[in-house]
Amino acid sequence: VPVLLSSLLFAAANAAAQAPVDCPTLPASSGLQWQQQVQSDFLICRASTADGREVLSLMLSQRDPNIPLSRSLREEKGSFGGESMYWYKPDLGGQQPPGYAERRISVVKLDKGRYAQIALYPGSTQEMGSLQQLAQGMSLNPTAVADGR
């Protein structure tokens, strides 16, 4: 029994040392909820409205997602995680599905070996502005892209 108990304590201490990484806090006034998916080398956070519509996705990774962002699709200037960036219309190979005009994507290099990929799926121009403001104000936990995440 003591061996089992010490094994359980070791496992609990190990789990506490590798506490799960969380998505940035969303303001209560946003009415959004995160759905979080943790993988070995990245974290995906999907923000949805009360009716389940996904309006923002955020991927934090140690690897550059290597998404080509064409200057011709560049739109608004913004910031994320303290870094200046631009929002782009996504390159959908010439397709323009409903709501395309308001969709935005960006990749931000936060520091050495830390990247954020942000995508917005607003239902209107007004919602797009609100989501850009929300993204700009997000506070990233410095361990959000810790080693091994």
Where are the regions that the model predicts?
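Bacterial N-terminal signal peptides that target proteins for export
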Residues: 1-8
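N-terminal signal peptide c-region/cleavage motif recognized by signal peptidases
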Residues: 11-14
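Secretory pathway targeting signatures of secreted, lumenal, and periplasmic proteins
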Residues: 18-68, 97-98
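Surface-exposed amphipathic alpha-helical segments
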Residues: 26-33, 116-149
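Hydrophobic beta-strand residues in large extracellular and virion-surface proteins
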Residues: 32, 45-47, 56-60, 85-88, ...
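A mature extracytoplasmic/lumenal domain signature
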Residues: 38, 62, 89-92, 120-124
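Short, conserved charged micro-motifs
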Residues: 66-70, 128-129
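Signature of long, low-cysteine stretches enriched in small and polar/charged residues
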Residues: 71-115, 121
